[in-house]
Design a protein with these regions (language model features):
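Active-site nucleophile-His-acid catalytic modules used for acyl/amide transfer and hydrolysis
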Residues: 134-196
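A positional/structural detector of protein chain ends, strongest at the extreme C-terminus
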Residues: 1-3, 195-196
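Short, surface-exposed acidic-centric catalytic microdomains
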Residues: 128-131
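N-terminal accessory segments that precede or flank the first globular/catalytic domain
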Residues: 2-7, 11-126
């Protein structure tokens, strides 16, 4: 019994003399928050609707507020614009259709998630003053602080692809611009119906 007692005391003194090593701070594998970077297009889309999900397709309307120039080669006369403004309450309208994406960049501590809304703006302009030909426009959507997206809804990849065809077909069938019956809003409603 004496030997076992001495052996226990010896082990206890060794344990006290050599404490358990504390983890090295540099080896600590704790959870860290990953940095997120939002593009201006994603920020504009999330501002219009907070429930957006990665890899999903969405559509929005984009209105040019009163006093903001349409640009993009539009040749509407001042009288036509004034009449349209009174009828619609805004300068111009288009439809933005696209997909929310998330990509990861960097390594280790520099790892970031980049969120984007890759989309196309579909709208119709008046190509010339006389006779007033319509023109289909489909540039990549770029966020603009003077224009706000308005929530439309969720759509599918197939319907998002059909938006371009619907816009082209509309302009092919409606060649001459008219404030009543063939304006930017009539065009926009046709594109919206294609993506609903």
């Amino acid at each position: 019994m004496r030997v076992s007692y001495l052996f226990s005391v010896l082990l206890a003194s060794l344990a006290v003399a050599s404490p358990v090593a504390s983890p090295n701070v540099s080896d600590d594998v704790s959870l860290t928050a990953r940095a997120t970077e939002d593009t201006p297009e994603y920020a504009a889309a999330i501002k219009a609707h907070s429930g957006l999900s990665k890899d999903k397709y969405y559509y929005f309307t984009l209105e040019w507020p009163l006093g903001v120039a349409v640009g993009d080669g539009d040749k509407e006369t001042d009288a036509e614009l004034k009449e349209l403004q009174q009828k619609l309450g805004f300068e111009h309208i288009g439809v933005v259709v696209g997909q929310v994406t998330e990509t990861e960049t960097g390594k280790g501590k520099n790892k970031k998630t980049k969120r984007d809304f890759i989309a196309t703006l579909y709208h119709m302009t008046k190509k010339n003053a006389n006779p007033g030909d319509t023109e289909f426009k489909s540039p990549n959507y770029r966020a603009n602080s003077k224009q706000n997206l308005k929530w439309g809804g969720e759509t599918s990849k197939k319907k998002a692809g059909a938006a371009k065809k619907a816009g082209k077909d509309y302009v092919d069938d409606h060649k001459i611009y008219k404030v009543d019956g063939n304006n930017c809003n009539d065009f926009a409603q046709t594109v919206i119906n294609a993506v609903k």
